[in-house]
Amino acid sequence: MHDIIVIGGGPAGLTAALYALRAGKSVLVIEKSTFGGQITWSPKVENFPGIPSVSGAELGDKFTAQALDQGAELELDEVTSVELDGDIKRVKTDFGGRVVMTVTSWEMLPR
């Protein structure tokens, strides 16, 4: 069982995982598609402070590597339901945790 389950492995989800890990929590991040999120599809990203021009794929890889380096567990799976009643929260993938964070984006953002 994990202290926190983050649903969504894009920039927001991986950032949430990093903050939880820094607070000493055990974290599982569940992503149904691509860790790093939609940014991984961008050929060039130039709007992150302190990071010069980088491909979205490279940036997504850096986000993912940092979460793993800090101790996050990453799982590729699709969450179809969440049970929020009681002290232990459950997702349909059978992982349990005390907190569930949902950080999702649009299915496909317009370009």
Where do the PLM segments sit?
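Flexible, glycine-rich phosphate/dinucleotide-binding loops
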Residues: 13, 36, 54
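Gly/Ala-rich phosphate-binding loop of Rossmann-like dinucleotide-binding domains
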Residues: 17, 21
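FAD-binding core/adjacent interface of flavoenzyme oxidoreductases
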Residues: 1-7, 22-23, 74-111
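Glycine-rich FAD pyrophosphate-binding loop
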Residues: 5, 22-41
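N-terminal Rossmann-like dinucleotide/flavin-binding domain of flavoprotein oxidoreductases
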Residues: 40-98
